């Protein structure tokens, strides 16, 4: 959004804001980014090179939401390293947004304003299209169409798509609230680090 072009060249890249490389929250940002992107063993070397022992003590800002413990990783990439459940991937994205905002001096309210005004399509999907089942999987549209007609009376057969049965209840999540929660928690963690030094 900062540079809406088909190609971003070095001069444009150099003007983009970036967090300080020595910021105390950088390992938290790196962990979430790596777990979103290191999807196959082709990324094993990158994972090993970037691994920080502090990853193992990191945790989600909304711990009861995610299905995968964030800090349950080691220095060697395994098939368990990447975040695969939709709700975990969503939470990582929310926390990355909050971390970068905090690191760049953007308030939580400003972050939410950017989300509403610059990412209107995502805002709409978050409120109307992205439903997660009881196991954190994104529910397909064909299942949601039946649910909209039948509500909680939807049958098990109607909740089954491909090889997955999507278990009730289905949830949407409030990205703005989650970004605020993440932001406040990362502020608290940053202040705690400052008093521990």
Regions found by a protein language model. Name each.
Residues 1-197:
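S-adenosyl-L-methionine
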């Amino acid at each position: 959004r900062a540079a809406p072009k088909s190609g971003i060249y070095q001069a444009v890249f150099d003007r983009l804001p970036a967090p300080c490389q020595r910021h105390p929250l950088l390992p938290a940002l790196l962990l979430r980014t790596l777990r979103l992107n290191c999807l196959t063993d082709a990324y094993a070397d990158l994972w090993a090179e970037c691994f920080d022992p502090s990853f193992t003590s990191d945790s989600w800002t909304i711990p009861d939401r995610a299905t995968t413990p964030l800090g349950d990783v080691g220095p060697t990439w395994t098939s368990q390293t990447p975040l695969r459940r939709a709700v975990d991937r969503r939470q990582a994205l929310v926390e990355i947004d909050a971390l970068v905002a905090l690191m760049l001096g953007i308030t939580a309210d400003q972050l939410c304003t950017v989300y509403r005004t610059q990412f209107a399509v995502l805002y709409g999907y978050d409120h109307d299209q992205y439903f997660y089942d009881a196991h954190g999987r994104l529910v397909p549209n064909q299942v949601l169409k039946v649910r909209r007609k039948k509500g909680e009376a939807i049958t098990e057969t109607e909740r089954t798509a491909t090889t997955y049965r999507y278990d009730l209840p289905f949830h949407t999540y409030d990205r703005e609230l989650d970004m605020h929660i993440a932001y406040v928690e990362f502020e608290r963690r940053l202040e705690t680090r400052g008093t521990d030094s």
